[in-house]
């Protein structure tokens, strides 16, 4: 089946939905056309009375290539349907709706044509609201004619406004409200790695300290490099970008920023711990290999154990040479129910019978029955000392956990019920 026939079938399927019903179904067809880009379907829905202004709803997970909560203009912008974007605005949809969501979607998805159109459109509207004159590079137009041009000539703004004209409009001696919107849009472009849009917005004069942080978080290394090379004076320290990149596991960004001369000074410990907390093994290894023994501490190992990151724990012990001389390591693993970490510690020689079999007592008390079975399999006798392990786990415990422990004992060690006082 060729693509044209396929598109026609899709159109016919959408038509069948809203031709049979009234009301919400034409809006459903309108929504589909914004997602799929079917301009004929869109126009037909409008002619049938579908409303575009203020229409939004939650989209569920079965919708592909759409944000979670959107309006129609954002849907069209997110999916790159320029014709739909223009028709929505012509039909009365306000680009400012939902805090310029459509502009931000287009920035993040790298649809430069849509971004330029929305920016230029808002530049004109700003001048209209200010009662000023709009001067294009190609001609001078009285302000009274602008609204007519917007309604009649769809492509006029997009095709005739140059960067210089828009820049002069937006960035006067006192920055206006829309210049702040452009600054915010730069963040979305940085997050999406949209280099063309990033350069366009920067050429307009956009500036936002959060853009480089956002690019670092999302691993947009090219954006990070470009912003640094632009030489902007960021009020936020690059060290914070390193920490955020490390927190999200963007090891390439971390490596680039550090090796560009931005060493972690006073925040190494925090950066390392937050990276371990989220379990980014490659980033942890890079930081440890670069900063050496400063990273191989008991606190770092406890952090890895608490979060159940057995691979990081193994790296710190085996490669970092951390000694297993702290009973808190095995107690923490059992307390948190991390059986893989417990197995690692036992395999490396830690004693699982410390303090009168405290690990299995903790495991039973916390209802980590998989760990209980593992330790029994390693030789711990749950019946020893007249059921002391079971009695200890029941004493002072919550009603919910007591009932679960009793059920476990009943199902697996019914002979112990006679010697346990509940």
Swiss-Prot record:
Instruction: State the ANK repeat positions.
Output: 25-54, 68-97, 99-127, 181-206, 207-236, 237-266, 268-295, 296-324, 325-354, 355-384
The protein's matches in Pfam families, at most eight in alphabetical order, are given as: Ank_2 (PF12796)
SMART domains xref list = ANK
The record's section on Gene3D superfamilies has:
Ankyrin repeat-containing domain (1.25.40.20)
Q: Which UniProt keywords apply?
A: ANK repeat, Repeat
| Name the record gives this protein | Putative ankyrin repeat protein R789
